[in-house]
Amino acid sequence: TKVYTNIGEEGKQYVNWAKENNYKVWPMITNSNMSQTSKMLGDYKLRESVINQIVDYITEYNLDGINIDFEGMYETDKDNFSRFLIELRPRLNEIGAVLSVDVTAPDGAPEWSLCYDRYTLGKTADFIMFMAYDQYGVSSTTAGTTAGCDWVETNVKKFLGQEEVSADKLILGIPFYTRIWKEVNGNVTSDVINIGNIDKVIPSNAQRNWDESLNQYYVEYKKNGVTYKVWIEDEKSIEAKLNLISKYNLGGAAYWEYDRSTESVWKLISEKIGIK
């Protein structure tokens, strides 16, 4: 099993720049195929091979840690995924590297949510990145928000309660995108919009209605016989999510992804939690 990387010369330059500016660098390692992921996780020799490559990669590029982003796994691979991280943990300890892992909200679909043993991951990793999105995703047959604040907070409580993840380990993942939903003859589809492009897509005369429970503006309009619905992510909705970090003493925030945002959102983040 080969871990393919695309850090390249530009990546090396970025790592050097980040370190010169006192940033820590944790590259993300992700999966792409459920059956191949299952094969790797279920075989000790393959897990060992991947772990060796991760350690070599961190050492070669002088990295500070690693972020494991395995999504879309079989529920039956839950224990083997935990085992993979348990085996990786001491190897990272030897080189002083941080281990973070991305997980979805509890109590969801088998291959999206039930494939994680959040309790064990919380005891193994330095940080648990809660991907607090998509509440209503691409496969949804119902239009809805990407990350309503009430839903986000409910799941934060689940991580801290039933999953027993330490608050200082829990990192709140915030989306820098939303979806524009299209309804035609009862059929629903959606496209992703970066928050920086929302005002370019929504008509200027469309009314924005504030939803107090979601902490979001909602817009609905018609065009050429198609009904469009958008739950807007902006400075106000993101601020509501950032407030959960201090409310529950969480370890910090993560974002998907950097270039989807705006200067005003980054300014807000800097003011709220001190990131520059």
Where are these regions (language model features)?
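Short, acidic/polar
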Residues: 42-60, 110-118, 232-246
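Hydrophobic faces of well-ordered beta-strands that scaffold small-molecule active sites
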Residues: 25-29, 66-68, 99-101, 128-130, ...
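Glycan-recognition patch characteristic of GH18 chitinases/ENGases
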Residues: 1-55
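Glycan-binding loop/region signatures in secreted carbohydrate-active enzymes
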Residues: 174-244, 273-276
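Short acidic, glycine/proline-enriched helix-loop-strand junctions
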Residues: 7-13, 20-21, 90, 94-97, ...
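Acidic/aromatic/glycine-rich contiguous surface patches that form carbohydrate-binding/processing clefts
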Residues: 241-276
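Substrate-binding surface in catalytic domains of secreted glycosidases
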Residues: 2-9, 52, 75-203
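Second-shell loop/turn segments in exported
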Residues: 1-6, 37-44, 70-78, 140-147, ...
